[in-house]
Amino acid sequence: MTLTKPPTAHPSNLDGLHNWITENCSSGAVPVLTGMNGDMDTVGSAISLAASNSNMMACGLHLGRISKRVCERLNAPFRKISNSSDLPKRLSAVIIVDAASSSQVGFDLPDDIPKCIIDHHASNNWELKDGDIYINMPVSATTEIIADYLATYSPETMTKPVRELLLAGLLTDSGRFKHNQKESFRSANVILDNSDIDLSLIHI
């Protein structure tokens, strides 16, 4: 099945996402793949989401300049891979973040396992099969979707480094709120809630 439009965003999207992650992580490795441009939104989303389950690991072809600097500063776990053969042998499923099509991953994905796509782009060129799930919300950055998911289903994952990764993704994709949607301010509040992070001190 090919979706020509993203599904309408509503809270049950995150319910479905949580159920999908729980089910697939219970039976094997679930790599969280970035878009091949390696920008801060895709990398921040992947590392933050992967931190919520020991069977997930953030992977991708490339770290962009900002992503590399932020990951080195935070000692954030990210595995560089060149193709699908570098993925774990016992795969349960794959998650792809911040990519509007499979071509944006940079290599062919395995056909025989479920996939989850989490994205904020209006365009969608994914072909979905049984067992796949597609989450798309009209926000400025994919890290906003990940922040809502973690705050609701895995609040213990919202450590200071994870919050900084989420913020970095939001700030870069929104141009530090210069071309953001109103929802981005709410997302920033979710990320900063009960933390000692000073937004003005986040340099990217």
Where are the predicted features?
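Short, Lys/Arg-enriched charge-dense amphipathic segments
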Residues: 52-63, 81-89, 104-110, 179-192
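Hydrophobic/aromatic residues located in beta-strands of well-ordered beta-sheets
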Residues: 56-58, 115, 166
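Active-site cofactor/cluster-binding pocket
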Residues: 72-132
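A structured phosphate/pyrophosphate-recognition subdomain
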Residues: 1-37, 45-53, 126-202
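Anionic-ligand anchoring segments at beta-strand to alpha-helix junctions in alpha/beta enzyme folds, i.e.
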Residues: 27-88
